[in-house]
Amino acid sequence: MDPSQNPRDLCQIYLEKFMVISNYRSLSFKKQKYLVIDKLSNYNNTDYRDVLQVNGYFTYCVQKNKLDAIQYLYENNLMNPENKSQLFKIAIVHGNIDVLKLVIDYGIDVSLDDHFAITVCTRPISNTENIIQLLIDNGADVTSNNNLPIKFAILKGTINKSVLDLLINNGADIHADEYFCAKYAAKCCYIFALKYIINLGIDVNMENGILLKNVLSDTAYSSNEYTYSCIKTLLENGADISFLDDNDTLKMCRGSKTRNILILLLDYGFDISFINEYQVKDSSKLSEINKILDQGIDPIKFILFTNEI
């Protein structure tokens, strides 16, 4: 896989593979055992029915921890390389470390399918840390595809300190690809990940305040609580608000739902005097407001009333 490809696109490819494997239906063990054994004896990977039945049987064995059934397939030479690969990936997706140990003992290459296992196992699955360590002990590369495993962990929701620690202690670079993880954590308001990366000593003012700008960029679409927490964390760790321009904060000045964020920035000295230079695009609106104020209405109370601050 091309490591220069956009990390988000790469992660999406692995996520799609993950979802395909996780959707194999678990088949009845008693009803399917002999049928599947027969199919494995004459396996046709171009027949989707064969593929679904075999992988469904593998899924059942993994979910129910049927180690004896899996051993039977190996000992009777019923597993071709493709079947072995699929069983391994199904065990990864379902987090079954017993099956993983078994297929590793039978010689599976843990880096198959362009390091699928070490990448997707950073998602929240059972035995995450033990599985990562098992893969590393058997040759998995946590820096594969330009450190994609740790990017996948950040992008796809494994906000888990022990998992991130394990990856980093085994060589993963969370600052790879021009601090992609930090920038993405800020943009998506992943507060734990952002704090974790800051604690590693990152420059919160990198690239002219890109982290603070990233947090503010999707304010309208993210949770106000997480946005506020991320901005507060950056400011408390020395983020310089002078990097912000008028466009970065204009929407917060206009929206009552983001007023708490605006107040937070003001507490740190943010200057919004540019509002005085605002040019009214629709003069009719200005005349409407003036007509209302001519009734003796207090401008401050009018703002409070109409914006429900």
Curated annotation (Swiss-Prot):
SMART domains: ANK. InterPro entries: Ankyrin_rpt, Ankyrin_rpt-contain_sf. SUPFAM superfamilies: Ankyrin repeat. Keywords: ANK repeat, Repeat. ANK repeats lie at residues 53-82, 83-112, 114-144, 145-176, 177-206, 214-243, 245-274. It comes from the Viruses. PANTHER family: ANKYRIN REPEAT AND PROTEIN KINASE DOMAIN-CONTAINING PROTEIN, ANKYRIN REPEAT-CONTAINING PROTEIN-RELATED. This is Putative ankyrin repeat protein R603. It comes from Acanthamoeba polyphaga mimivirus.
